[in-house]
């Protein structure tokens, strides 16, 4: 894989992973629309490692609290904010693991990796995000995250396995419907991404490690570093903008891209 292709894929993954515009959809589209080679599983895992590092660093205080609370959780005690956060993150991740295994075992996932599917999901879930953002309340903050809300958002997150949906987009949508303000909705959605990315990496990482060579390791390291920097920049920018801007710019982008993709798919 050329350095230019590697740079492009890592940059796109880093920028789109946490913005509500679907990273998987963009990574599937790049090879199809630009005629570049598919990144392969090794690079896919590497860029996810990079984005994982970025979100952990950005939310290190929350991550540290969840780690510190895990021993208490293992003894059945959910009596600290950290233990509660760790518990709710686990609960919210269960649906996506179950649905992911179902799609993998049945082979359905491969049939969903098409321009038409991505076009429809970009368009439909972009409009749903707009609806949720306009009608959603602001009475809840991230500290109000409850078991019921974790289950609800976890079920919505599972739908994001359909390419083009956007994991962050659909969990933010769910949070806005549940009454979380914009910053809190994004914060909870980003925290939910951590165990989800880890789970995805565990499934794919073992095979990659077993078959990796020196070239793959070099490309993976470059991709991880680039996606880390891009993701960290995207997170910083998004949360700064959310202080004064709604999710409408992301919706407009999704609708325009969705329409273009549908025209390409059905032309």
UniProtKB/Swiss-Prot annotation:
The source organism is Jannaschia sp. (strain CCS1)
Concerning HAMAP family, the annotation shows: Undec_diphosphatase
Q: Mention one GO biological process in which this protein takes part, according to its record.
A: cell wall organization
One Pfam family, short name? BacA
Family from the record: Belongs to the UppP family.
Q: Which GO terms describe its molecular function?
A: undecaprenyl-diphosphatase activity
Reaction catalysis annotation: di-trans,octa-cis-undecaprenyl diphosphate + H2O = di-trans,octa-cis-undecaprenyl phosphate + phosphate + H(+)
Q: Membrane topology per the record?
A: Multi-pass membrane protein
E.C. designation(s): 3.6.1.27
Instruction: Kindly list the organism's lineage.
Output: Bacteria, Pseudomonadati, Pseudomonadota, Alphaproteobacteria, Rhodobacterales
Q: Where in the cell is it found?
A: Cell inner membrane
Q: Hydrolase as a keyword?
A: yes
Q: Which NCBIfam families match?
A: PRK00281.2-4
Know the name of this protein?
Undecaprenyl-diphosphatase
Further comment? Bacitracin is thought to be involved in the inhibition of peptidoglycan synthesis by sequestering undecaprenyl diphosphate, thereby reducing the pool of lipid carrier available.
**What does the UniProt record say this protein does?**
Catalyzes the dephosphorylation of undecaprenyl diphosphate (UPP). Confers resistance to bacitracin.
Instruction: Tell me which UniProt keywords the record has, alphabetically.
Output: Antibiotic resistance, Cell inner membrane, Cell membrane, Cell shape, Cell wall biogenesis/degradation, Hydrolase, Membrane, Peptidoglycan synthesis, Transmembrane, Transmembrane helix
From the record, give the transmembrane residue ranges. 1-21, 40-60, 85-105, 112-132, 189-209, 219-239, 245-265
Q: Which GO terms describe its cellular component?
A: plasma membrane
User: Which domain of life, per UniProt?
Assistant: Bacteria
The record's annotation in InterPro entries points to:
UppP
């Amino acid at each position: 894989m050329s350095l230019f292709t590697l740079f492009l894929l890592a940059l796109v993954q880093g920028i789109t992973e946490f913005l509500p515009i679907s990273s998987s959809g963009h990574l599937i589209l790049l090879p199809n629309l630009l005629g570049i080679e598919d990144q392969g599983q090794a690079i896919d895992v590497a860029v996810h490692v990079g984005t994982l590092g970025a979100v952990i660093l950005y939310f290190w205080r929350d991550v540290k609290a969840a780690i510190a609370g895990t021993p208490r959780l293992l003894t059945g005690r959910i009596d600290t904010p950290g233990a509660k956060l760790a518990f709710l993150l686990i609960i919210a991740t269960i649906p996506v693991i179950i649905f992911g295994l179902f799609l993998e075992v049945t082979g359905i996932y491969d049939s969903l990796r098409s321009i038409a599917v991505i076009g429809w999901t970009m368009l439909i879930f972009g409009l749903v995000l707009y609806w949720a953002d306009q009608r959603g309340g602001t009475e809840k903050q991230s500290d109000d995250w409850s078991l019921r809300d974790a289950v609800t958002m976890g079920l919505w997150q599972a739908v994001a396995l359909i390419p083009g949906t956007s994991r962050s987009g659909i969990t933010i949508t769910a949070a806005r419907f549940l009454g979380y303000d914009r910053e809190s909705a994004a914060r909870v959605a980003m925290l939910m991404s951590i165990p989800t990315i880890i789970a995805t990496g565990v499934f794919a990482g073992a095979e990659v490690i077993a078959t990796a060579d020196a070239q793959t390791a070099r490309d993976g390291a470059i991709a991880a570093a680039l996606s880390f920097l891009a993701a960290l920049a995207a997170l910083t920018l998004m949360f700064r903008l959310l202080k004064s801007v709604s999710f409408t710019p992301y919706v407009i982008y999704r609708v325009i891209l969705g329409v273009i993709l549908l025209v390409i798919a059905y032309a």
